[in-house]
Amino acid sequence: MPFGNTHNKYKLNFKAEEEYPDLSKHNNHMAKALTLEIYKKLRDKETPSGFTLDDVIQTGVDNPGHPFIMTVGCVAGDEESYVVFKDLFDPIIQDRHGGYKPTDKHKTDLNHENLKGGDDLDPNYVLSSRVRTGRSIKGYTLPPHCSRGERRAVEKLSVEALNSLTGEFKGKYYPLKSMTEQEQQQLIDDHFLFDKPVSPLLLASGMARDWPDARGIWHNDNKSFLVWVNEEDHLRVISMEKGGNMKEVFRRFCVGLQKIEEIFKKAGHPFMWNEHLGYVLTCPSNLGTGLRGGVHVKLAHLSKHPKFEEILTRLRLQKRGTGGVDTAAVGSVFDVSNADRLGSSEVEQVQLVVDGVKLMVEMEKKLEKGQSIDDMIPAQK
């Protein structure tokens, strides 16, 4: 596995020019931002836990680009990475998050009552609704860098916290290594569990080391509230259900997440957060809220409309295939979610999804009847 920063000192025997990666064929945010000057300036630096510039960029060097989406091409190994390597991370964050400046402040709003509507998305079109976020536990390094012992400590802490939840959140933890192949595959097929670590982005960044040690899934009894432990982030918190009631999904998400955060705080392990980056996560694309509010929505006609991409962009939404980031749409069903993470709040981001999906379903219905939607094309939000 292409990973290991053990010989950083040895690399300094070579000139920066000799070590600088060839990024001429690359299409990711890191490749755009990493000049030779920045490489020279940062290559001998490391965070207190020993994460280096080459560790930050390796995944983007090994994965030049993705056909559908502009990938970020770098990861953080710990909370300090964003400070020590800010000369690289700042331009990447600015580029990825619509001009978000190093002086900007992020805002958080997890009061679900501030969401307007969302309980009336047409279930004939909106097949399922889901909101997820990531959280990192202060005092531990992140998945690209953590040791086995550290990863197991994160798992132990998380399971103790999650097992103390009650009521609608009462549930159970299922460690990956005690699952059979069949059980695992079933959970993946049902969209409950993260995939096996075949993604080159996971592999090249070192996040899949020691797999499946100390990874698992915790979920409540009716599988509407789930927590992944030690995949790309320490925790991924997910609220989901069939149909179009995003209001209820978001309520459960906010309430459950705040309960978990409270338990971790009491145990002396708050989540990583600062007022500039919001919640600190492994991938710079998730900074801020870490939130992706998405629906599986059937858009047989709209998806063939020449303005489909433009409509999504104007609504500040993005689409993925039915099975997630690397997949195609099956039966005109798309995974549509908020494009923004940083600089706007959780409520604002889910509001964009609710309002935007509602509009797109109305457009779809008009197109079914053979009517024009030109007068419905939204302005840029």
Curated annotation (Swiss-Prot):
The modification Phosphoserine is found at S164, S178, S199, S372. Keywords: ATP-binding, Kinase, Nucleotide-binding, Phosphoprotein, Transferase. It is an enzyme of class 2 (transferase). Its EC number is 2.7.3.2. Residues 125-367 form the Phosphagen kinase C-terminal domain. Residues 11-98 form the Phosphagen kinase N-terminal domain. It comes from the Eukaryota. PROSITE patterns: PHOSPHAGEN_KINASE, PHOSPHAGEN_KINASE_C, PHOSPHAGEN_KINASE_N. The modification Phosphothreonine is found at T166, T180, T313, T322. Pfam families: ATP-gua_Ptrans, ATP-gua_PtransN. ATP binds at residues 128-132, 191, 236, 292, 320-325, 335. It catalyses: creatine + ATP = N-phosphocreatine + ADP + H(+). Dimer of identical or non-identical chains, which can be either B (brain type) or M (muscle type). With MM being the major form in skeletal muscle and myocardium, MB existing in myocardium, and BB existing in many tissues, especially brain. Belongs to the ATP:guanido phosphotransferase family. Reversibly catalyzes the transfer of phosphate between ATP and various phosphogens (e.g. creatine phosphate). Creatine kinase isoenzymes play a central role in energy transduction in tissues with large, fluctuating energy demands, such as skeletal muscle, heart, brain and spermatozoa. This is Creatine kinase M-type. It comes from Sus scrofa (Pig). The gene is CKM.
